[in-house]
Amino acid sequence: MRYLVFQLTLHGMKQRRRHFPRLKLITLVILLSAIIAWVAWSFWPSSARQMKRSVAIFTCQSWYEMVCKGKTILYVSDIATDTALVRPSLQQDSCVRTTYSTGVWVNSCFFIPSCRGRMVTVMTKPNEINRQDAWTLIEKEKERNQKRIRQLRDQLKELNYYLRINNVHDEGYNTVAAYAYEKEAEKAHCIRLAQLFDTVRKTDRPQLIRKAVYTAYYRLPNGECQQARMREVGSSKQCQTVLLQTVGRTTPTGVAPLSVFFVNGKSHGAALAVGYGGLGVKELASSDASCSIIPTTLHDNRHDLPAVLGGDGSPVFSKRGYFIGITKGNEVITRSQLRGLLRKEKQP
């Protein structure tokens, strides 16, 4: 009996030794297949359809809030280069400034699908305003507002004089009356601002805080337009690029994220760009724009793509479909610069 058990055990060991090389071979084949699939996925060029699905329209709705004693007392659309407050108002809706650019969905790691709603685009971020600078801006705006009130009063004197001496209510009279009404409303607005500025003291330590809402507009495979709220997770002041991510940290359905390889692509010759018509022109920009593939030519990482066909952030591909970079002005931001941006991602 013991001899029989011994023989059966010995036979089982021989069978396992015989199957062990076969198991190693199967494992090796599976591993090699996975590596080949990974290499093919990583380095396979984008098709025309994938190029179009890699982009979205990015909008930034921004404004400034003047905060005094923890309360918002004034809204400002922007701060001009001459430090003038642009369109100060007591209502937020009249101060929202919308800018457009092209956004590109990207993977954080080039060798695996790792988008999770990440997007790169071009956007100039203004410098933060400290309390001292905020008070200086308020003082200058207070002076400008008083000057504007004096100008409006002088204009209204002339307009009201014209209306008094002309009793015939013809078309010219009605036009002047409507213009005078607009100027009267503008003067009333400036007076309200003056009253507000008079209540602000330097000891109140007023602040000017920039607010922004980011949204990405993309299309499903059936052409239906969708939108996703975005948040900033990184930026490069030198390249004027921004890394964003969907609020839910998920990749939208139907998009085709691009992989940013660790070496730069071609910088000369014929290339292709994906652009939204009119997005690079302020008067034509719209979230309803459609993208198209446009031929362009590169020379030392510069392109000849007209702004009316593709604005900042438009992705550039080689003729074979390999991602090269994104546009900023007439330059192309390279893959290495974009990888530097990806490394600056802030952890939540």
Label every PLM stretch briefly:
Residues F43, Q92, T98, P221-C225, ...:
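Flexible, gly/ser-rich surface segments that form the specificity/activation loops bordering the active-site cleft
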Residues W44, S54-K202, G313-F317, F323-E331:
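Catalytic histidine site
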Residues I35-S47:
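Membrane-interface motif at the C-terminal end of an N-terminal transmembrane signal
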Residues F111-N130, A178-H268:
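Conserved active-site neighborhood of the chymotrypsin/trypsin-like protease fold
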Residues H11-L32:
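N-terminal Sec-pathway targeting helices
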Residues M1-M13:
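N-terminal intrinsically disordered, acidic low-complexity segments at the extreme N-terminus
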Residues Q347-P348:
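PDZ/PDZ-like groove recognition
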